Amino acid sequence: MTRHCDVSIPDSPEPPFPITTSFVDVIAGFGRGSAELGIPTANVPIDDLPKIVEQLDTGVYFGWCKVRMAKDRDTKVEQRPDGREVQYNNGTLLNDEDLAVLPVVLSVGWNPFYQNKNKTVELHIIHKFSDNFYGAQIKFNFLGYIRPELDYTTKDALIADIHTDIEIAKEKLQLPGYRKLKDTL
């Protein structure tokens, strides 16, 4: 499972980790994670995260996350730049399993394959949700670094690497040094 780009991951977090966020809103991204890659992501405003996140190396990280409903908000529909509509249900369709603390793989960077102009933070929660949760809130931690951000020549290579990232994250999160931080969210 080791690739040339993978970094050595210790058995428990080492500085600057763990980095834990407050609850932040889940916003609509480009819609590529689900539609093009089959790997849905939750997007969050990077400006709402601890300042240290902007200083992190670009690449792939792992940790834990917790989603919660955003109360007292009206549902709404927004339009993506490509014209597709996004329904903000604020997490009202989440079930108890969706609201548990869940493993997450995080991408911090520019997504060179898609030539993004702005740095983003995207979370792939390792869980099958039955519906979207745009407008809900999410709290998460960065516990370790898997690999640097890469540019891909094919979508298939990108998808394969994301699946490997997920397997590495699941394996590392089972180690006691990482597993115990599940309870901090």
Swiss-Prot record:
InterPro entries, sorted: Riboflavin_kinase (IPR023468), Riboflavin_kinase_bac/euk (IPR015865), Riboflavin_kinase_dom_sf (IPR023465)
Cofactor: Zn(2+); Mg(2+)
Record flagged with keyword Transferase: yes
Cofactor details (free text): Zinc or magnesium.
Gene Ontology biological process: FMN biosynthetic process; riboflavin biosynthetic process
Residues the entry annotates as binding Mg(2+): T41, N43
Gene Ontology CC entries for this record: mitochondrion
UniProt-annotated catalytic positions: E122 (nucleophile)
Keywords on record: ATP-binding, Flavoprotein, FMN, Kinase, Magnesium, Metal-binding, Nucleotide-binding, Transferase, Zinc
Pfam family, one: Flavokinase
Pathway this chain belongs to: Cofactor biosynthesis; FMN biosynthesis; FMN from riboflavin (ATP route): step 1/1
Enzymatic reactions: riboflavin + ATP = FMN + ADP + H(+)
Keyword Transferase included in the entry's annotation: yes
EC number per UniProt: 2.7.1.26
Signal peptide start-end: none
An example molecular function term from Gene Ontology annotations: ATP binding
PANTHER family in the record: RIBOFLAVIN KINASE (PTHR22749:SF6), RIBOFLAVIN KINASE/FMN ADENYLYLTRANSFERASE (PTHR22749)
Similarity remark: Belongs to the flavokinase family.
Functional description taken from the UniProt entry: Catalyzes the phosphorylation of riboflavin (vitamin B2) to form flavin mononucleotide (FMN) coenzyme.
Protein name in the entry: Riboflavin kinase
